[in-house]
A protein has these predicted regions:
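Conserved signature/switch motifs of ABC ATPase nucleotide-binding domains
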Residues: 143-146, 164, 196
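Helix-to-loop junction immediately C-terminal to a conserved catalytic motif
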Residues: 57
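ABC ATPase NBD coupling module
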Residues: 74-90, 121, 193-195, 237-238
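Conserved ABC ATPase signature
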Residues: 144-148, 152-154
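Short coil-to-helix segment of the ABC ATPase nucleotide-binding domain corresponding to the Q-loop/switch region
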Residues: 102-111
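Catalytic Walker B motif of ABC-type/P-loop ATPase nucleotide-binding domains
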Residues: 169-172
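Conserved ABC transporter NBD signature motif
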Residues: 65-73
């Protein structure tokens, strides 16, 4: 039986450097992310993790190098072209960023319509309902954010990020406001999303989760990619993430 071939990368960074003035937030970083893969991005504060996520979502451009997302050269895009790339990248934040006057269903549907103006209200609500069901809170569609627990709010945020079925999902410290049990539930959800075929990249300081899950781990230190460890080899990296 032949081994399963690794699919081509959906995200590719080539010799990427990003500087804020004279300080290099990222320094000559090469990175490839593949479909069906959950990858953790770790490193001390100021290592460049958030900058790397912003480059993938084209919130900023590299000073040097190339950033490719779903075949699109993010580094080449003009401001008027960015929306097309962002439809291919779902984003989950630490603080949820839900609109307080909208229900869970409306928050997810609104996110879809913002990214794709051609979607009708009816289709947006149908797809939002499906997304909420997929992340395990299909029974809370009519709830407002203040009526939901932190874990439930984060699931709404994940549903909003994946409702357009992007090939890439990035998450910036998504467990920062969650207790450990709820954080584990969220990681289970990210593993499910990766199994759907999505490339999932999670920036985190939660070393317990990283070491126990034993997925691929990319370590940044002072803007440099210091280690890229495949699944099953995460236990030896904890000191780098906390130094």
């Amino acid at each position: 039986m032949r081994p399963t071939a690794t699919p081509p990368p959906i995200v590719l960074l080539r010799a990427v450097t990003h500087a804020y003035g004279s300080r290099k937030a990222l320094d000559n970083v090469d990175l490839a992310l593949h479909p069906r893969e959950l990858t953790f991005l770790v490193g001390p504060s100021g290592a460049g993790k958030t900058t790397l996520l912003k480059l993938i979502n084209r919130e900023t451009r590299p000073t040097r190098g190339q950033v490719w997302v779903a075949g699109i050269g993010a580094h080449e895009l003009k401001a008027s072209q960015v929306a097309g790339l962002r439809r291919r990248v779902g984003v989950v934040f630490q603080d949820y960023k839900l609109l307080p006057r909208l229900t869970a269903l409306e928050n997810v549907a609104f996110g879809l319509q913002v990214s794709d103006l051609s979607v009708s209200n009816e289709e947006a609500q149908d797809r939002a309902r499906d997304a909420l069901e997929a992340v395990g809170i299909g029974d809370r569609t009519a709830s407002f954010p203040h009526q939901l627990s932190g874990g439930q709010q984060q699931r709404v945020a994940v549903a909003r990020a994946v409702v357009a079925q992007p090939p890439v999902l990035i998450a910036d410290e998504p467990t920062g406001n969650l207790d450990q049990a709820t954080a584990w539930d969220l990681m289970d959800l990210f593993e499910d999303i990766a199994a759907w075929g999505t490339a999932v990249l999670v920036a985190t300081h939660n070393i317990e989760i990283v070491t126990r899950l034993q997925r691929r781990v990319v370590t940044l230190v002072n803007g440099r990619l210091m280690r890229d460890q495949p699944a099953g080899h995460a236990g030896r990296m904890a000191w780098l993430a906390t130094s």
